Amino acid sequence: MERKDFETWLDNISVTFLSLTDLQKNETLDHLISLSGAVQLRHLSNNLETLLKRDFLKLLPLELSFYLLKWLDPQTLLTCCLVSKQWNKVISACTEVWQTACKNLGWQIDDSVQDALHWKKVYLKAILRMKQLEDHEAFETSSLIGHSARVYALYYKDGLLCTGSDDLSAKLWDVSTGQCVYGIQTHTCAAVKFDEQKLVTGSFDNTVACWEWSSGARTQHFRGHTGAVFSVDYSDELDILVSGSADFAVKVWALSAGTCLNTLTGHTEWVTKVVLQQCKVKSLLHSPGDYILLSADKYEIKIWPIGREINCKCLKTLSVSEDRSICLQPRLHFDGKYIVCSSALGLYQWDFASYDILRVIKTPEVANLALLGFGDVFALLFDNHYLYIMDLRTESLISRWPLPEYRKSKRGSSFLAGEASWLNGLDGHNDTGLVFATSMPDHSIHLVLWKEHG
């Protein structure tokens, strides 16, 4: 049939076909299919898929495709990536979807990075790490051996761990290698804090001392307490050292001169923790940038002015129970915005701007958890048998790690958390290094470390 004649015939057939009922149209199609050969059937098969199975990701504008993808969970999205190259390309290009998926896992997000494929890879890495935490496979352990008597003082900073012992020595360890960097002769150590040049120690001999790492020389000796010194902190910027003691007193010292500037009284129990920290919020009594002095005993947390006024008064006292029926656990967290402490009733979080209790986090499945570290996303907790990670958004325990029979001091000085940045959200790089350290009955130090990504 000539082309012109064919087009005329086709037009006539089309007019007639459109006048048929649906049933007649179906019968006509069935008859035509029965008359078709292999070439016609293959043509029909190829075109039916396009007509009947519309690929919305391929046909819709990219903005609408991204909007639809935001309603799917990440695991479904990963499955959809396997449908076709086109689907994989579109889904892997949706930055917001993968950033949100990472945020929901508690990972820190840099919004300036808009590379969708980067965030998809971060998500895949994140779910692997979260699976390891869930399956108790995210950590590994190690030991530091070198002391010959009990170790009751630990302090960690930037990959270095300081240990103070009753063997009259303090050692500085490189956690990554397990090697002792410095070892100096001291007095008995109940508390330690260090920087690159110096070590400050609080002792059971009722004094505080400052030592030089490089020479081991004692550069300053602070005398005045009448009980063991359980906690120390200092600021080079202020040239101030603070100490808390079993004599119920907090003392403020001139760091370089060694003279006592003030004695703060008001505690009726051992002062087990002192913290010198800059305020990050405008509070009722402080402005951002002001230095804050906190002290804690087994019942109360006190906030003090930093000055030289004699008989200066405590600015604020925080407690869990007015009748002292509930004790505070020894570890105290203060980051300039929030004060957090654990008790038998759970974790208490105070807003430093108002001193109000923001929330009480209870863990009914595990009682009497002690606080090690607290962040925006995670908290690190422990008891006599396990180390726990809590997701603070859901207040649920998402991981635990077994601990050996360690030496747990009532003051909280013989155990500590390591790197803390991951508590504000993992980012694929900060889940390295030390997680937890504690002294052992055999005088060694037990370390829990992040296992490298597999």
UniProtKB/Swiss-Prot annotation:
Residues 54-101 form the F-box domain. The keyword Magnesium does not apply. Pfam families: F-box-like (PF12937), WD40 (PF00400). One of its GO terms (cellular component) is cytoplasm. The modification N6-acetyllysine is found at residue 298. Coiled coil: none annotated. Keywords: Acetylation, Repeat, Ubl conjugation pathway, WD repeat. WD repeats lie at residues 146-183, 185-221, 224-265, 276-314. It comes from the Eukaryota. Gene3D superfamilies: 1.20.1280.50, YVTN repeat-like/Quinoprotein amine dehydrogenase. The keyword Repeat applies. InterPro entries: F-box-like_dom_sf, F-box_dom, FBXW2, G-protein_beta_WD-40_rep, WD40/YVTN_repeat-like_dom_sf, WD40_repeat_CS, WD40_repeat_dom_sf, WD40_rpt. Directly interacts with SKP1 and CUL1. Substrate-recognition component of the SCF (SKP1-CUL1-F-box protein)-type E3 ubiquitin ligase complex. This is F-box/WD repeat-containing protein 2.
